[in-house]
Each structure stands twice: as structure tokens, then as C-alpha cells.
């Protein structure tokens, strides 16, 4: 049953309710975006102005309306309030409404809303801090698996496979990046985000997620280079003093032991790929990781993964119709 099939005026009424709920969730997601990267509580203290410390009253926290009523300025000190706060609220409300249009009043709406509530803050956190907090991606992955259980064992199995395939494929790319190029090929948190997407969208959608994210990220990256030129790193040029080499990835010392049975060597491969730590940056001469500074033209991959996940979640049936059948099949039939 979709919202349009509800009796009388209840269909539009519930649609408006879900949109307003999305606005309120978006207001909370602004708190998540601001506090989670700093390891601060998202419950206490109450929201306040970061400049003057003015604690916001309840009527200053009404999504969209408070920002407009305050004319985008703090009531305590008059400092401008970023337009991103109402934009996140509006974006979340619109995505909630889009999920309703896509799934109707069915159980599938529940995991869709949960996924939206995870992807929005993760995208903005990665834009701001270049991190994807494990405190969000790992519980999100588990939530995707758990929410698939009421849909039946096939859906539950697909969610498990999606999480496993997403994590292991990106873990392998991460390993190959260090083994072959001696540098980081992917962000450390990307594999957990892809595992979360696999749990919600199933493993069949992962190729589409990777393809859409890579293409859109590449287009924007090229446009940024054309607009700004090839900017160097934000720090001084250090080509004359190259960073220390990354440690050789020999997995574990057991591989070098003579007489080790072949079956043990094969068994150690997946185990070591899963548990061996891979540094996030090259090591200096003392063996400590150097501080990594993104170039001015660099953009994180997390937002593009989140965007691709939302596109497949909301536009899957439409993409299946407009794309050639062989491409749609290659992308797992799309969700």
C-alpha cells in the first residue's frame, strides 16, 4: 500500500508527516556531523553557539523555521549561522519523502530510512574531516543485516553476502595498493562504508555503487582540475626529501618458515588479509606515520559512495528501464 492508496486525506497527511519527520531527523544529523568526528556526546550538552556559548532554546531548534526566523544569525552574539544546517535538514526531509515514493508504506521503507539517516552524516563528515567513523559504519552494517531478517532468509543471506563481499573486495584493493604502489589506494574507512551499503542494498548492487561513485567522482575531479589547475599539496614541496618507504607487506613470518605445509600457507592468506594492519600513511624514518594532508584538488571517496548508494536505492527501477538490459544485468539487475 502506497501513501496514495490510503483512504481519504490520510495519504497526503502521512506523506507530510514523513517529510516533517525527515526535517527533525536532519536537525539531529547536524549534531552528529558536528560532534561524532570530535568524539563528543550527541546527547549532552545541549546545542549551543560555538562562538559565544549561547544555549539554544527549543524554539531556536525548529528545523528550517528557526534559521529563517533568526535571519541566519545567533540570537546571542549575531554571528552568521551556516546555511548548511537548514540544507541538511531539507535534504533529509526530501530523501525521506523520496523513500516513501519509492517503497510506499511497506516494511522496505524502514531500512531505506535507516540507510538515509546513516549516509547523510557520513558524507558530510567525510567532506569535513576525511574520515568515516567506525562508530557509525560498523553499527550501520549490523543494522542492515538485522533489518533484512524480517524479509526472509534469502534477504538475510543476501545482506550477509553484501557486507562480506563489500568489505573483502575493498580490503583486497587496500592491500594491493600498498603491496604494488607502496601507498594508500583507498581510505581506511571506505571498506566499512561499502560493507554497510552491501548489507542494505545486497551484494548485487555493489558493482553499480562502485561504478557510479567512480564515474561521478572522476567527472567532478576533472572539473575541479580544469577550474583550479593542478594544485600541489597544502604543505611545502617535499620532493627533495621523500617520505620513508611503507613497510613491506610480508603478511606474517610464518610464510617464510621452511617446511610449512601448503594448506597452512593457503589458510593464512585470508586470515592475514583481514587482520594485518595497513598504515594510513607512509612511515617516517622512526617508523611513525607521517601526518597526511590532502591536496587542494583532492576530494574524499565517501560522499560519492554515499551518493551512488542513494541513487541505486531510490532510482533502481528507473535505471533498470533506461539502461541497456546487458548493463543492468551486469550491475546486478539494480535494486
UniProtKB/Swiss-Prot annotation:
InterPro entries: Peptidase_A24A_bac (IPR014032), Prepilin_IV_endopep_pep (IPR000045), Prepilin_pept_A24_N (IPR010627), Prepilin_peptidase/N-MTase (IPR050882)
Keywords, sorted A to Z: Cell inner membrane, Cell membrane, Hydrolase, Membrane, Metal-binding, Methyltransferase, Multifunctional enzyme, Protease, S-adenosyl-L-methionine, Transferase, Transmembrane, Transmembrane helix, Zinc
Keyword rRNA processing: no
Binding of Zn(2+), residues: 49, 52, 74, 77
GO biological process: methylation; signal peptide processing
Subcellular location: Cell inner membrane
Transmembrane segments: 13-33, 105-125, 131-151, 206-226, 258-278, 299-319
Membrane-protein topology: Multi-pass membrane protein
GO cellular component: plasma membrane
Needed co-factor(s): Zn(2+)
The keyword Transmembrane helix appears for this protein: yes
EC number: 3.4.23.43, 2.1.1.-
Cofactor note (record): Zinc is required for the N-terminal methylation of the mature pilin, but not for signal peptide cleavage.
A Pfam family recorded for this sequence: A24_N_bact
Major location (coarse): membrane
Gene3D superfamilies on file: 1.20.120.1220
Family to which the UniProt record says this protein belongs: Belongs to the peptidase A24 family.
UniProt function note: Plays an essential role in type IV pili and type II pseudopili formation by proteolytically removing the leader sequence from substrate proteins and subsequently monomethylating the alpha-amino group of the newly exposed N-terminal phenylalanine.
Protein name: Prepilin leader peptidase/N-methyltransferase
Amino acid at each position: 500500500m502506497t501513501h496514495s492508496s490510503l483512504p481519504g486525506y490520510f495519504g497526503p497527511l502521512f506523506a507530510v508527516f514523513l517529510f516533517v519527520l525527515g526535517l527533525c531527523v536532519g536537525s539531529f544529523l547536524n549534531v552528529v556531523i558536528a560532534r561524532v568526528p570530535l568524539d563528543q556526546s550527541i546527547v549532552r550538552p545541549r546545542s549551543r553557539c560555538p562562538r559565544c556559548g549561547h544555549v539554544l532554546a527549543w524554539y531556536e531548534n525548529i528545523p528550517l523555521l528557526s534559521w529563517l526566523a533568526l535571519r541566519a544569525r545567533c540570537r546571542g552574539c549575531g554571528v552568521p549561522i551556516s546555511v548548511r544546517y537548514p540544507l541538511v535538514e531539507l535534504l533529509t526531509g526530501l530523501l525521506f519523502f523520496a523513500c516513501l515514493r519509492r517503497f510506499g508504506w511497506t516494511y522496505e521503507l524502514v531500512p531505506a530510512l535507516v540507510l538515509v539517516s546513516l549516509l547523510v552524516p557520513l558524507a558530510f563528515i567525510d567532506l569535513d574531516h576525511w574520515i568515516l567513523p567506525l562508530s557509525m559504519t560498523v553499527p550501520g552494517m549490523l543494522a542492515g543485516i538485522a533489518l533484512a531478517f524480517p524479509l526472509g532468509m534469502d534477504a538475510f543471506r543476501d545482506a550477509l553476502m553484501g557486507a562480506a563481499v563489500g568489505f573483502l573486495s575493498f580490503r583486497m584493493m587496500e592491500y594491493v595498493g600498498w603491496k604494488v604502489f607502496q601507498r594508500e589506494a583507498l581510505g581506511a574507512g571506505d571498506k566499512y562504508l561499502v560493507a554497510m551499503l552491501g548489507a542494505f542494498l545486497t551484494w548485487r548492487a555493489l558493482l553499480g555503487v562502485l561504478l557510479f561513485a567512480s564515474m561521478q567522482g572522476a567527472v567532478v575531479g576533472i572539473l575541479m582540475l580544469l577550474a583550479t589547475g593542478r594544485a600541489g599539496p597544502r604543505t611545502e614541496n617535499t620532493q627533495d626529501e621523500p617520505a620513508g618507504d611503507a613497510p613491506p607487506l610480508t603478511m606474517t613470518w610464518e610464510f617464510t618458515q621452511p617446511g610449512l605445509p601448503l594448506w597452512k600457507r593457503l589458510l593464512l592468506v585470508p586470515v592475514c588479509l583481514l587482520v594485518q594492519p595497513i598504515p594510513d600513511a607512509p612511515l617516517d624514518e622512526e617508523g611513525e606515520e607521517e601526518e597526511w594532508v590532502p591536496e587542494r584538488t583532492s576530494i574524499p571517496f565517501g560522499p560519492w559512495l554515499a551518493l551512488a548508494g542513494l541513487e541505486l536505492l531510490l532510482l533502481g527501477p528507473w535505471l533498470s528501464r533506461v539502461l541497456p538490459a546487458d548493463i543492468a544485468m551486469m550491475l546486478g539487475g539494480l535494486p
